[in-house]
């Protein structure tokens, strides 16, 4: 996927994640005007292309819609040669603006991983796609040690 289309997905995700995706209106679990469903679909497309651009293998991309009061989560688990990365995109319950979480992992079955790192919806709005790739690729470099969170 092109840099321009991935930047478009970043902007679209930032916009969706600044609106209320959790909708407590009975049968309308897709949020107002289907925004929750749009978030989950765009999130999966974005993460699949991100995995390819990061050069990951053993990739798992998934979406969990959650319940009616939450945004749902899009996730990516992928491996380089000796280490990997886990990425989640979600609307957190506390309104701190953190929408993308990433951390190093040792295997595709490592659900504890290292320390969490966060990006905000503002970062997704303003950063270029190459800047995002560079930030996430830093976990691949030898200088980034894997440490288990307490």
State each model region's role.
Residues 2-80:
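Negatively charged, low-complexity tracts enriched in Asp/Glu with abundant Ser/Thr
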Residues 1-11, 141-150:
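Short intrinsically disordered terminal tails
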Residues 33-34, 66, 96-98, 112-113, ...:
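Intrinsic-disorder/low-complexity loop/linker signature
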Residues 40, 47, 133-147:
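Charged, low-complexity intrinsically disordered regions
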Residues 71-141:
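Intrinsically disordered, low-complexity regulatory segments enriched in Ser/Thr/Pro
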